[in-house]
Amino acid sequence: MLAKRIIPCLDVRDGQVVKGVQFRNHEIIGDIVPLAKRYAEEGADELVFYDITASSDGRTVDKSWVERVAEVIDIPFCVAGGIKTIADAEQIFAFGADKISINSPALADPNLITALADRFGVQAIVVGIDSWFEKETGKYWVNQYTGDESRTRQTNWQLLDWVKEVQQRGAGEIVLNMMNQDGVRNGYDLVQLKKVREVCKVPLIASGGAGETVHFRDAFVEANVDGALAASVFHKQIINIGELKAYLTKEGVEIRR
């Protein structure tokens, strides 16, 4: 069995790390590079950086900080935000990123997934999916342009259909951002994760809802995800990554040292 991954997520806006609740009301957390360095030193397995307004602003990720991050950390990192072309991706890889993640641009042009996977290999291409649970209908929908509250919209894709589609097109990994849980810290949506796990044959990363160490354990043990992504519990030092890994090891979860 592959070891499970602990992945801090850094949402970036205007050169700063920010964090919201359910993708809204973002507060500034701090500077990108010192936070990245701290997480690497604490034992994070990789980092994910989302330039959250790039797609909604119609631009690509601000690359000025990508190179600076690559200089100070020695763990893999993934960059997302408005990547719409092979050239966009080439630049980000050239600055030192190990993976790229696409979300809204993939919804706008699903062929982009295949083009990027063919050019850089599936292992380097992550598809981020922002899901929203509609309580009235019991359906899970895929949302687009979630970095900007005023532009966020529900697509016509139901979650499981889109998960299947992106795999067929060459996604090497899926990060499921469960919007209802985001920043609330009451646990990952295990029901949703289990449904996605059934149809997801590539590595699946859970995102949205971590508040306590047991939430990570539940995602790994009950939903069998490959990685757990979290932001606010790490940013606010509610959970220390080293202590989290020690707890998971004690719980019998195989974790990277």
UniProtKB/Swiss-Prot annotation:
- SUPFAM superfamilies membership: Ribulose-phoshate binding barrel
Per the record, the pathway is: Amino-acid biosynthesis; L-histidine biosynthesis; L-histidine from 5-phospho-alpha-D-ribose 1-diphosphate: step 5/9
What compartments host this protein? Answer: Cytoplasm
The processes (GO biological process) annotated in the record are:
L-histidine biosynthetic process
Q: Which UniProt keywords apply?
A: Amino-acid biosynthesis, Cytoplasm, Histidine biosynthesis, Lyase
Fetch the InterPro entries from UniProt.
Answer: Aldolase_TIM (IPR013785), His_biosynth (IPR006062), HisF (IPR004651), IGPS_HisA/HisF (IPR050064), RibuloseP-bd_barrel (IPR011060)
The disulfide bridges present are: none
Q: Where is the active site?
A: D11, D130
- Could you tell me the EC number(s) of this protein? 4.3.2.10
Q: How does it assemble?
A: Heterodimer of HisH and HisF.
Q: Which family does it belong to?
A: Belongs to the HisA/HisF family.
The identity of this protein, by name, is Imidazole glycerol phosphate synthase subunit HisF
Source organism: Actinobacillus succinogenes (strain ATCC 55618 / DSM 22257 / CCUG 43843 / 130Z)
Gene of this entry: hisF
